[in-house]
């Protein structure tokens, strides 16, 4: 390919290489001409060319691409694969990285005998410039470390979700707050009159309390009769749910990660005949109830957005912990499934 470009532009292959990599030694006019000819010939950008052309559609493949490191946690190397939401994060990241001329390689932070210091050195010695931190797998509480102590001065870095408290990195997240409001609005439009929220405390911590914050905002507006006190359980127990349910008698439940769904099923309630159910992450409930109503978090778009942020930081030469971290929030979409129905519009 270098020879073809050199023949078309009338300069040496060395000059073509310098121009494609944005190095000194060629004039700006020559560089622009080389990039134009390269694009016409269907040259696939490696990350160096992406710095100059930002997002060329490719027609031919090259043997070598640059790597972005995906840092995962959990009990095993493949723990993250148990969750459809996280698989979609990674799928979205892979697809977007490929468009930029990168590939994504997983590095397990809990590898036996591995320290984060050593892992950072391994990534750096590989010439990897960009790091993506996947959501931390450990159950979160005030007693669990939520830090990733890597030498971030070596890399550009971004986080997917918001499970890491330190460092405060640029991150791509789902807009959990707006999704709760959207779920409440949709259930209200279906004429549900008493809508309850049931969450495991650790899961609400993973989103920094945004679900409960949004619910309480609407509770303040709509009143306690329509939105009873949320049931936030440090340790999910059926008896606690039964007491709460018997007291407030909701006709719809919002929950996530199959928690409220399992409570309703164990209680023997018909869904949606006796009570409606909406998930804050339909992918998380899909194993138990494949056609559940609720929020599609568009997790593949979150993963793609993380790569967008990371490649932009690499291209600008931004490494280390940012002084002012940036956030990209991706809105969810309501998915109407079989766990909710349109109810008669009766006066309460």
List the predicted regions and their residue ranges.
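Hydrophobic alpha-helical segments within soluble ligand-binding/sensing domains
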Residues: 168-197, 237-242, 296-317
